From Swiss-Prot:
Main localisation: cytoplasm
Keywords: Cytoplasm, Methyltransferase, S-adenosyl-L-methionine, Transferase
UniProt gene name: prmA
Cell compartment(s), UniProt: Cytoplasm
Ligand binding (S-adenosyl-L-methionine): T144, G165, D187, N229
Function: Methylates ribosomal protein L11.
Protein name: Ribosomal protein L11 methyltransferase
Annotated GO MF terms: protein-lysine N-methyltransferase activity
GO CC annotations, alphabetized: cytosol
Source domain of life: Bacteria
GO biological process, one term: methylation
Catalytic activity: L-lysyl-[protein] + 3 S-adenosyl-L-methionine = N(6),N(6),N(6)-trimethyl-L-lysyl-[protein] + 3 S-adenosyl-L-homocysteine + 3 H(+)
InterPro entries referenced in this protein's UniProt entry, alphabetically: Ribosomal_L11_MeTrfase_PrmA, Ribosomal_PrmA_MeTrfase, SAM-dependent_MTases_sf
């Protein structure tokens, strides 16, 4: 079924007003989009940032009178409408379109991330079946790729791994499939823990090999390998805690770090770890090292 799509160019200050007004005049969905490919990194706590130049897309039933809807919108907001357009678009199978764009990916020499609905390109490889589900972590982001490639290059046989900020569970599950004895996952988001649990089951990982915790419930036990793909700010503030969770001689991999933040994060760990050269990809970095 076709839809009427209305696009408006707004400022962040106008976002809430126009979202409410569009729903009031009959929009069935409202979506915010970046108008200038401007990234948002590490917002302040308790904020929901928008881009400096934002496009607001609203979908209406196809038989909606666009002129009347826009006139009503102007009345509700009490101001002249910003730059806008309206067009009828054909319906799409959005889920199928998204699934078609998520293809198997290889990381390092052994490891493949394979969508759960896709056949493994190399059945004899280490294939991690993944449904991105409710949380981040599919391998498409440079930070996830950097961590997966690092794990693929490690001898993990018999190791205990801690995935701090586990998201979809992709790093912990990869470690288990690559030979780790056990992986512990922790995340502040209960939905992330649920996604990790689902993805572990999809890969036939027994629950006792992949226990999951909220941070406040995480047992204090040292790991042979710790991976944390989160953000630079938390990595710096959590440095003493994360260092204490790695045994002497254990290995560390950190990412979620912008290139310009790399030296600051590395400095926070330099007293506890012998650090490797920083790895860089597409403006993001990975920091690795061994516990003294």
């Amino acid at each position: 079924m076709p839809w009427l799509q209305v696009r408006l160019a707004i400022s962040p200050e106008q976002a809430e007003t126009y979202e409410d007004a569009l729903l009031e005049v009959g929009a069935v969905s409202v979506t915010f989009m970046d108008a200038e490919d401007q990234p948002i990194f590490e917002p302040e706590l308790n904020t929901t940032p928008l881009w400096t130049h934002t496009h607001l897309l609203a979908l209406f039933e196809a038989d909606t009178n666009a002129e009347m809807a826009l006139a009503h919108l102007s009345l509700l907001t009490g101001e002249e409408l910003p730059e806008h357009s309206a067009e009828v678009i054909e319906d799409q199978d959005w889920e199928r379109s998204w699934m078609d764009n998520f293809q198997p990916m290889c990381f390092g020499k052994r490891l493949w991330i394979v969508p759960s609905w896709h056949a493994a390109p190399q059945p004899d490889a280490v294939n991690l079946l993944l449904d991105p589900g409710l949380a981040f972590g599919t391998g498409t982001h440079p930070t996830t790729a950097l961590c997966l490639e690092w794990l693929d290059g490690q001898d993990l046989k018999g190791c205990n791994v801690l995935d701090f900020g586990c998201g979809s569970g992709i790093l912990a599950i990869a470690a288990l499939l690559l030979g780790a004895e056990q992986a512990v996952g922790t995340d502040i988001d209960v939905q992330a823990l649920e996604a990790s649990r689902d993805n572990a089951g999809r890969n036939k990982i027994a629950a006792e090999r992949f226990p999951l915790y909220l941070p406040e419930d995480l047992p204090h036990q040292q790991a042979d390998v710790l991976v944390a793909n989160i953000l630079a700010g938390p990595l710096v503030s959590l440095a003493p805690q994360l260092a204490s969770l790695v045994r002497t001689g254990g290995r560390l991999a950190l990412s979620g770090i912008l290139a310009e933040q790399g030296e600051e994060v590395a400095a926070a760990y330099a007293d506890s770890f012998d650090l490797d050269p920083i790895a860089n990809r597409d403006g993001w970095v990975r920091i690795t090292g061994r516990r003294r």
